[in-house]
Amino acid sequence: MKTKFKKNGRRLLAAILCLVMAVMALPMSAFAWTSEEGKRCTSSFGDYYVGSDGEYYRSKATYSFIVYDSKGNITVQSIKAGNAKRKYLMTDNSGTHQVYCVESGIDFNTGNSYVSKNGKNSSYFRKLPTDAQFGVMMALMYGWHEGKSSPVAGTNTDDYAFATQTIIWEYQQQLRTSPSDLHSANGIDADTYRYSLKGRPAEKCYDWILSQMASHYTIPSFAARNQNKADTYTLKYNPDKQNYSLTLTDTNNTLANLSLSASGIKVSRSGNQYTFTSDKMITSPITVSAQKAVNLDCDEMLIWGCVGKQTMVSGASDPVYFYFKLDTETYGTGLIKKTSEDGVVSGIKFNISGNG
Protein backbone atom coordinates (compact mmCIF):
# COMPACT_ATOMS: atom_id res chain seq x y z
CA MET A 1 0.00 0.00 0.00
CA LYS A 2 2.84 2.39 0.86
CA THR A 3 4.52 1.72 -2.47
CA LYS A 4 1.26 2.33 -4.33
CA PHE A 5 0.66 5.55 -2.36
CA LYS A 6 4.15 6.82 -3.14
CA LYS A 7 3.68 6.14 -6.85
CA ASN A 8 0.29 7.85 -6.91
CA GLY A 9 1.68 10.74 -4.89
CA ARG A 10 4.50 11.23 -7.37
CA ARG A 11 2.02 11.17 -10.25
CA LEU A 12 -0.19 13.75 -8.51
CA LEU A 13 2.78 16.00 -7.79
CA ALA A 14 3.94 15.73 -11.40
CA ALA A 15 0.46 16.65 -12.63
CA ILE A 16 0.35 19.69 -10.33
CA LEU A 17 3.78 20.84 -11.51
CA CYS A 18 2.69 20.49 -15.15
CA LEU A 19 -0.42 22.58 -14.43
CA VAL A 20 1.64 25.27 -12.72
CA MET A 21 4.09 25.40 -15.64
CA ALA A 22 1.21 25.62 -18.13
CA VAL A 23 -0.34 28.54 -16.24
CA MET A 24 3.02 30.33 -16.07
CA ALA A 25 3.43 29.87 -19.82
CA LEU A 26 0.15 31.65 -20.63
CA PRO A 27 0.45 35.17 -22.06
CA MET A 28 -0.26 37.98 -19.59
CA SER A 29 -3.48 38.94 -21.39
CA ALA A 30 -5.00 35.54 -20.64
CA PHE A 31 -5.86 37.20 -17.31
CA ALA A 32 -8.11 40.22 -17.84
CA TRP A 33 -6.63 43.49 -16.64
CA THR A 34 -8.70 46.62 -16.18
CA SER A 35 -10.64 49.45 -17.80
CA GLU A 36 -11.25 50.96 -14.37
CA GLU A 37 -10.44 54.55 -13.47
CA GLY A 38 -8.69 55.18 -10.15
CA LYS A 39 -6.75 51.92 -10.32
CA ARG A 40 -3.33 52.11 -8.65
CA CYS A 41 -0.24 50.40 -10.04
CA THR A 42 3.48 50.38 -9.33
CA SER A 43 5.95 51.05 -12.15
CA SER A 44 9.00 49.04 -13.16
CA PHE A 45 11.22 48.38 -16.17
CA GLY A 46 10.87 45.17 -18.14
CA ASP A 47 13.22 43.40 -20.51
CA TYR A 48 14.97 45.10 -23.41
CA TYR A 49 13.24 45.10 -26.79
CA VAL A 50 15.01 42.49 -28.89
CA GLY A 51 14.24 42.38 -32.60
CA SER A 52 13.75 39.19 -34.56
CA ASP A 53 17.25 39.87 -35.91
CA GLY A 54 18.60 39.40 -32.37
CA GLU A 55 19.58 43.05 -31.90
CA TYR A 56 18.44 45.68 -29.40
CA TYR A 57 16.54 48.79 -30.45
CA ARG A 58 18.40 52.00 -29.56
CA SER A 59 17.57 55.69 -29.64
CA LYS A 60 19.76 58.36 -31.21
CA ALA A 61 22.88 59.32 -29.24
CA THR A 62 21.32 62.74 -28.61
CA TYR A 63 17.90 64.03 -29.51
CA SER A 64 15.47 66.84 -28.77
CA PHE A 65 11.87 66.51 -27.61
CA ILE A 66 8.96 68.72 -26.62
CA VAL A 67 7.54 68.96 -23.11
CA TYR A 68 3.95 70.08 -22.43
CA ASP A 69 3.17 72.30 -19.44
CA SER A 70 -0.13 72.29 -17.53
CA LYS A 71 -1.72 74.63 -20.11
CA GLY A 72 -0.56 72.65 -23.13
CA ASN A 73 2.27 75.04 -24.03
CA ILE A 74 5.46 73.38 -25.20
CA THR A 75 9.18 73.82 -24.63
CA VAL A 76 12.00 72.00 -26.39
CA GLN A 77 14.60 70.08 -24.41
CA SER A 78 17.51 67.83 -25.38
CA ILE A 79 18.89 64.65 -23.90
CA LYS A 80 21.91 62.36 -24.31
CA ALA A 81 20.76 58.83 -24.97
CA GLY A 82 21.75 56.05 -27.39
CA ASN A 83 20.64 53.46 -24.88
CA ALA A 84 18.88 50.20 -25.65
CA LYS A 85 15.14 50.61 -25.20
CA ARG A 86 13.34 48.75 -22.42
CA LYS A 87 9.71 47.86 -21.83
CA TYR A 88 7.54 49.70 -19.30
CA LEU A 89 5.56 47.67 -16.79
CA MET A 90 2.72 48.30 -14.34
CA THR A 91 1.93 45.93 -11.45
CA ASP A 92 -1.28 45.66 -9.44
CA ASN A 93 -2.97 42.84 -7.54
CA SER A 94 -3.85 41.12 -10.83
CA GLY A 95 -0.25 40.88 -11.99
CA THR A 96 2.25 42.72 -14.16
CA HIS A 97 1.32 44.29 -17.49
CA GLN A 98 3.23 46.03 -20.27
CA VAL A 99 2.21 49.61 -21.09
CA TYR A 100 3.35 52.33 -23.49
CA CYS A 101 4.93 55.71 -22.86
CA VAL A 102 2.97 58.73 -24.11
CA GLU A 103 5.37 61.39 -22.82
CA SER A 104 8.77 61.04 -24.46
CA GLY A 105 11.86 62.34 -22.66
CA ILE A 106 10.37 62.43 -19.15
CA ASP A 107 11.78 60.17 -16.41
CA PHE A 108 10.25 56.76 -15.76
CA ASN A 109 11.51 55.12 -12.59
CA THR A 110 10.91 51.89 -10.74
CA GLY A 111 8.59 51.94 -7.73
CA ASN A 112 6.41 54.93 -8.56
CA SER A 113 2.68 54.81 -7.82
CA TYR A 114 0.53 55.43 -10.90
CA VAL A 115 -3.23 56.06 -11.05
CA SER A 116 -5.45 55.35 -14.08
CA LYS A 117 -7.83 57.77 -15.79
CA ASN A 118 -10.03 57.54 -18.84
CA GLY A 119 -8.54 59.47 -21.75
CA LYS A 120 -11.46 61.91 -21.65
CA ASN A 121 -10.70 62.69 -18.00
CA SER A 122 -6.91 62.91 -18.26
CA SER A 123 -5.78 66.54 -18.20
CA TYR A 124 -2.47 65.53 -19.78
CA PHE A 125 -4.01 63.62 -22.68
CA ARG A 126 -6.64 66.29 -23.38
CA LYS A 127 -4.00 68.99 -23.80
CA LEU A 128 -2.35 67.11 -26.67
CA PRO A 129 -3.39 68.39 -30.12
CA THR A 130 -6.47 66.62 -31.50
CA ASP A 131 -4.40 65.04 -34.29
CA ALA A 132 -2.03 63.66 -31.66
CA GLN A 133 -4.87 62.23 -29.58
CA PHE A 134 -6.41 60.55 -32.63
CA GLY A 135 -3.04 59.20 -33.74
CA VAL A 136 -2.14 57.74 -30.37
CA MET A 137 -5.54 56.09 -30.06
CA MET A 138 -5.44 54.57 -33.55
CA ALA A 139 -1.86 53.36 -33.04
CA LEU A 140 -3.08 51.56 -29.93
CA MET A 141 -5.98 50.06 -31.90
CA TYR A 142 -3.70 48.38 -34.42
CA GLY A 143 -0.56 48.03 -32.33
CA TRP A 144 0.63 45.26 -30.06
CA HIS A 145 -1.15 44.32 -26.83
CA GLU A 146 -0.53 41.43 -24.46
CA GLY A 147 -1.49 38.14 -26.05
CA LYS A 148 -1.29 39.38 -29.66
CA SER A 149 1.18 37.97 -32.15
CA SER A 150 2.82 40.02 -34.87
CA PRO A 151 0.74 40.27 -38.08
CA VAL A 152 3.89 40.71 -40.17
CA ALA A 153 5.81 37.65 -41.35
CA GLY A 154 9.40 37.40 -40.17
CA THR A 155 8.90 39.68 -37.15
CA ASN A 156 8.31 39.05 -33.45
CA THR A 157 6.19 40.68 -30.76
CA ASP A 158 9.05 42.95 -29.66
CA ASP A 159 9.28 44.29 -33.22
CA TYR A 160 5.52 44.84 -33.21
CA ALA A 161 5.43 46.50 -29.78
CA PHE A 162 8.41 48.77 -30.45
CA ALA A 163 6.84 49.89 -33.74
CA THR A 164 3.68 50.76 -31.81
CA GLN A 165 5.67 52.75 -29.26
CA THR A 166 7.50 54.62 -32.02
CA ILE A 167 4.28 55.77 -33.70
CA ILE A 168 2.85 56.90 -30.34
CA TRP A 169 5.93 59.05 -29.73
CA GLU A 170 5.78 60.55 -33.23
CA TYR A 171 2.20 61.73 -32.68
CA GLN A 172 2.83 62.93 -29.12
CA GLN A 173 5.85 64.91 -30.33
CA GLN A 174 3.82 66.50 -33.17
CA LEU A 175 6.07 64.96 -35.83
CA ARG A 176 3.11 63.14 -37.32
CA THR A 177 -0.40 64.47 -37.98
CA SER A 178 -1.64 61.54 -40.06
CA PRO A 179 -0.49 58.04 -41.06
CA SER A 180 0.97 59.45 -44.30
CA ASP A 181 2.59 62.64 -42.96
CA LEU A 182 5.89 62.56 -41.05
CA HIS A 183 7.67 65.90 -40.79
CA SER A 184 10.07 67.94 -38.67
CA ALA A 185 8.39 70.20 -36.11
CA ASN A 186 9.47 72.64 -33.40
CA GLY A 187 13.10 72.13 -34.39
CA ILE A 188 12.89 68.35 -33.92
CA ASP A 189 13.97 66.10 -36.80
CA ALA A 190 11.26 64.01 -38.43
CA ASP A 191 13.29 60.81 -38.07
CA THR A 192 14.07 61.27 -34.35
CA TYR A 193 12.10 58.15 -33.43
CA ARG A 194 11.95 56.34 -36.76
CA TYR A 195 15.76 56.29 -36.65
CA SER A 196 15.61 53.49 -34.06
CA LEU A 197 13.84 51.03 -36.37
CA LYS A 198 14.96 52.12 -39.82
CA GLY A 199 16.12 49.05 -41.76
CA ARG A 200 15.15 46.78 -38.86
CA PRO A 201 12.33 44.21 -38.59
CA ALA A 202 10.18 46.64 -36.58
CA GLU A 203 10.03 48.94 -39.62
CA LYS A 204 7.83 46.37 -41.37
CA CYS A 205 5.45 46.39 -38.40
CA TYR A 206 5.60 50.21 -38.34
CA ASP A 207 4.52 50.37 -42.00
CA TRP A 208 1.78 47.80 -41.41
CA ILE A 209 0.30 49.68 -38.43
CA LEU A 210 0.29 52.97 -40.35
CA SER A 211 -1.47 51.34 -43.32
CA GLN A 212 -4.17 49.96 -41.01
CA MET A 213 -4.59 53.37 -39.39
CA ALA A 214 -4.98 55.05 -42.79
CA SER A 215 -7.62 52.52 -43.79
CA HIS A 216 -9.47 52.93 -40.51
CA TYR A 217 -9.53 56.72 -40.79
CA THR A 218 -11.30 56.50 -44.17
CA ILE A 219 -15.06 56.72 -43.62
CA PRO A 220 -17.98 55.69 -45.88
CA SER A 221 -18.69 58.14 -48.70
CA PHE A 222 -22.26 58.72 -47.53
CA ALA A 223 -21.12 59.87 -44.07
CA ALA A 224 -19.53 63.04 -42.68
CA ARG A 225 -17.02 63.58 -39.88
CA ASN A 226 -19.03 66.52 -38.58
CA GLN A 227 -22.66 66.21 -37.48
CA ASN A 228 -23.48 69.59 -38.99
CA LYS A 229 -22.39 68.37 -42.43
CA ALA A 230 -24.31 65.10 -42.35
CA ASP A 231 -26.59 64.42 -45.32
CA THR A 232 -30.16 63.13 -44.87
CA TYR A 233 -31.30 59.88 -46.51
CA THR A 234 -34.94 58.81 -46.73
CA LEU A 235 -35.89 55.18 -46.16
CA LYS A 236 -38.66 53.92 -48.45
CA TYR A 237 -41.66 51.95 -47.26
CA ASN A 238 -41.90 48.30 -48.30
CA PRO A 239 -45.55 47.17 -48.01
CA ASP A 240 -44.62 43.50 -48.37
CA LYS A 241 -42.17 43.55 -45.46
CA GLN A 242 -43.99 46.36 -43.67
CA ASN A 243 -40.79 48.23 -42.90
CA TYR A 244 -38.69 51.07 -44.24
CA SER A 245 -35.33 50.52 -45.91
CA LEU A 246 -32.70 52.10 -48.12
CA THR A 247 -29.47 50.83 -49.64
CA LEU A 248 -26.49 53.19 -49.93
CA THR A 249 -23.30 52.62 -51.89
CA ASP A 250 -19.97 53.42 -50.26
CA THR A 251 -17.79 54.63 -53.13
CA ASN A 252 -14.83 54.82 -50.72
CA ASN A 253 -15.01 51.02 -50.48
CA THR A 254 -14.19 50.88 -46.77
CA LEU A 255 -15.78 47.40 -46.71
CA ALA A 256 -16.31 47.62 -42.95
CA ASN A 257 -19.29 46.54 -40.90
CA LEU A 258 -20.86 49.37 -38.92
CA SER A 259 -21.92 49.90 -35.34
CA LEU A 260 -24.77 52.44 -35.00
CA SER A 261 -25.85 54.59 -32.07
CA ALA A 262 -29.51 54.90 -33.10
CA SER A 263 -31.92 52.39 -31.58
CA GLY A 264 -34.40 50.75 -33.93
CA ILE A 265 -32.13 51.12 -36.97
CA LYS A 266 -30.55 47.98 -38.39
CA VAL A 267 -27.74 47.86 -40.93
CA SER A 268 -26.42 45.03 -43.08
CA ARG A 269 -23.59 45.06 -45.59
CA SER A 270 -22.95 43.27 -48.87
CA GLY A 271 -19.64 44.41 -50.33
CA ASN A 272 -19.81 48.19 -50.49
CA GLN A 273 -23.63 48.22 -50.26
CA TYR A 274 -25.19 49.14 -46.90
CA THR A 275 -28.89 48.52 -46.28
CA PHE A 276 -30.53 50.46 -43.44
CA THR A 277 -33.86 49.23 -42.10
CA SER A 278 -36.42 50.56 -39.62
CA ASP A 279 -39.62 48.86 -38.51
CA LYS A 280 -41.12 52.18 -37.48
CA MET A 281 -41.76 55.47 -39.23
CA ILE A 282 -39.27 58.22 -38.40
CA THR A 283 -41.34 61.38 -38.06
CA SER A 284 -38.36 63.76 -38.28
CA PRO A 285 -34.75 63.16 -39.39
CA ILE A 286 -32.47 61.62 -36.76
CA THR A 287 -28.69 61.97 -36.65
CA VAL A 288 -26.96 58.61 -36.56
CA SER A 289 -23.52 58.32 -34.98
CA ALA A 290 -21.56 55.38 -36.38
CA GLN A 291 -18.24 53.61 -36.04
CA LYS A 292 -16.58 50.76 -37.84
CA ALA A 293 -17.20 47.48 -36.02
CA VAL A 294 -13.67 46.57 -34.94
CA ASN A 295 -12.68 43.92 -32.40
CA LEU A 296 -10.00 45.68 -30.35
CA ASP A 297 -9.28 42.56 -28.29
CA CYS A 298 -8.09 44.58 -25.29
CA ASP A 299 -9.36 46.77 -22.46
CA GLU A 300 -10.51 50.38 -22.88
CA MET A 301 -7.77 52.98 -23.15
CA LEU A 302 -6.48 54.27 -19.83
CA ILE A 303 -3.95 57.03 -19.15
CA TRP A 304 -1.63 56.30 -16.22
CA GLY A 305 -0.30 59.35 -14.37
CA CYS A 306 2.26 59.98 -11.65
CA VAL A 307 3.21 63.55 -10.69
CA GLY A 308 6.56 64.51 -12.20
CA LYS A 309 6.98 61.21 -14.04
CA GLN A 310 6.35 59.89 -17.53
CA THR A 311 2.69 59.50 -18.50
CA MET A 312 1.79 56.00 -19.67
CA VAL A 313 -1.09 54.46 -21.63
CA SER A 314 -2.73 51.04 -21.89
CA GLY A 315 -5.65 49.50 -23.78
CA ALA A 316 -7.29 51.05 -26.83
CA SER A 317 -10.40 53.01 -27.82
CA ASP A 318 -11.67 53.97 -31.27
CA PRO A 319 -11.69 57.78 -31.79
CA VAL A 320 -13.22 57.71 -35.29
CA TYR A 321 -16.91 58.56 -35.44
CA PHE A 322 -18.92 59.57 -38.50
CA TYR A 323 -22.45 60.80 -39.04
CA PHE A 324 -25.45 60.74 -41.36
CA LYS A 325 -29.16 61.45 -40.96
CA LEU A 326 -32.04 59.09 -41.63
CA ASP A 327 -35.69 59.80 -42.29
CA THR A 328 -38.60 57.74 -43.61
CA GLU A 329 -41.20 58.59 -46.18
CA THR A 330 -44.69 59.03 -44.78
CA TYR A 331 -47.01 56.19 -45.54
CA GLY A 332 -50.61 55.58 -44.54
CA THR A 333 -53.87 53.91 -45.51
CA GLY A 334 -57.29 55.43 -46.01
CA LEU A 335 -60.82 54.05 -45.99
CA ILE A 336 -63.44 55.62 -48.27
CA LYS A 337 -67.06 54.87 -47.54
CA LYS A 338 -69.62 55.62 -50.26
CA THR A 339 -73.00 56.86 -49.09
CA SER A 340 -76.08 58.35 -50.79
CA GLU A 341 -79.47 59.66 -49.72
CA ASP A 342 -81.34 56.80 -51.37
CA GLY A 343 -78.83 54.20 -50.18
CA VAL A 344 -77.80 53.27 -53.72
CA VAL A 345 -74.02 53.61 -54.12
CA SER A 346 -73.36 51.21 -56.96
CA GLY A 347 -71.78 52.91 -59.97
CA ILE A 348 -70.91 56.13 -58.15
CA LYS A 349 -67.42 57.32 -59.11
CA PHE A 350 -65.01 59.40 -57.01
CA ASN A 351 -62.15 61.61 -58.09
CA ILE A 352 -59.32 61.74 -55.52
CA SER A 353 -56.62 64.37 -55.96
CA GLY A 354 -53.79 65.76 -53.89
CA ASN A 355 -50.05 66.42 -53.77
CA GLY A 356 -49.04 63.25 -51.90
How would you name each of these model-derived features?
Residues 32-39, 278, 351, 356:
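...the same signal can extend to comparable exposed beta-sheet modules
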Residues 246-252, 335-349, 355:
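Structural motif
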Residues 176-330:
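Acidic/charged, solvent-exposed loop-and-adjacent secondary-structure segments enriched in E/D, K/R, S/T
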Residues 22-31:
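C-terminal segment of classical bacterial N-terminal signal peptides
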Residues 7-20:
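Sec-dependent N-terminal signal peptides
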Residues 171, 261, 351-355:
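Predominantly extracellular/luminal cell-surface or secreted proteins
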Residues 33-215:
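Short, surface-exposed polybasic-aromatic patches that bind anionic ligands, especially phosphate groups
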Residues 1-5:
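N-terminal Lys/Arg-rich, disordered targeting/topogenic segments
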